[in-house]
UniProtKB/Swiss-Prot annotation:
Belongs to the cytochrome b family. PetB subfamily. The keyword Phosphoprotein does not apply. Heme 1 (or BH or b566) is high-potential and absorbs at about 566 nm, and heme 2 (or BL or b562) is low-potential and absorbs at about 562 nm. InterPro entries: Cyt_b/b6_N (IPR005797), Cyt_B6_PetB (IPR023530), Cytb/b6-like_sf (IPR027387), Cytochrome_b_N_euk/bac (IPR048259), Di-haem_cyt_TM (IPR016174). This is Cytochrome b6. One of its GO terms (biological process) is respiratory electron transport chain. Its main location: plastid. Component of the cytochrome b6-f complex, which mediates electron transfer between photosystem II (PSII) and photosystem I (PSI), cyclic electron flow around PSI, and state transitions.
Length: 215
């Protein structure tokens, strides 16, 4: 094993990377409330893992969506547990995100030179809410259908471009298969990709600038 490690160490300098990560200075004022952002990240990873598992059985069609969710809950081994963890972890993600925002605001973590870190955090908050909106529709039950109808109908009040925005969101004039397809694509591909990108940016800026000082 040592020879294999030495081979990689010679080419990638693994030890130098490990030393840099482990030797990062942590200010003495840091407490458990500074871990809230990390809990959000862990919740996101759980979302990705459980969501990916459900894509093997979920069918994004108006005729089969609800039936496929029922199948996951009743017939797939541990399917009920996977879907329940998916739902619980999103609740945890939203709660921890709200608490994280309060902690950052109260400790002044948004001030110079960390303005961009705050901006990426706000974008991540919007993406998190978007996950909830798009995911709510996927079972395509009565609650999901009417929730989507109301949410996608909100832009209709915007002058001139409102109707076009509604049609873009719904994939047509009315809520239907086009809407479900769009929301499924957003929920399983577009939003996770954007979230991963902005999380990486968020972490790199924190890594570069360090943790903000106490009040």
């Amino acid at each position: 094993m040592s020879k294999i490690y030495d081979w990689f160490e010679e080419r990638l300098e693994i030890q130098a990377i490990a030393d840099d990560i482990s030797s990062k200075y942590v200010p003495p004022h840091v407490n458990i409330f500074y871990c809230l952002g990390g809990i959000v990240f862990v919740s996101f990873l759980i979302q990705v893992a459980t969501g990916f598992a459900m894509t093997f059985y979920y069918r994004p069609t108006v005729a089969e969506a609800f039936t496929s969710v029922e199948y996951i809950m009743t017939d797939v081994n541990f399917g009920w547990l996977i879907r329940s963890i998916h739902r619980w972890s999103v609740s945890m993600m939203v709660l921890m995100m709200i608490l994280h925002v309060f902690r950052v605001y109260l400790t002044g973590g948004f001030k110079k030179p960390r303005e961009l870190t705050w901006v990426t955090g706000v974008i991540l908050g919007v993406l998190t809410v978007s996950f909830g909106v798009t995911g709510y529709s996927l079972p395509w039950d009565q609650i999901g259908y009417w929730a989507v109808k109301i949410v996608t109908g909100v832009p209709d009040a915007v002058p001139v471009v409102g109707a076009s925005i509604v049609e873009l969101l719904r994939g047509g004039v009315s809520v239907g298969q086009g809407t479900l397809t769009r929301f499924y694509s957003l929920h399983t591909f577009v939003l996770p990709l954007l979230t991963a990108v902005f999380m990486l940016m968020h972490f790199l800026m924190i890594r570069k600038q360090g943790i903000s000082g106490p009040l």
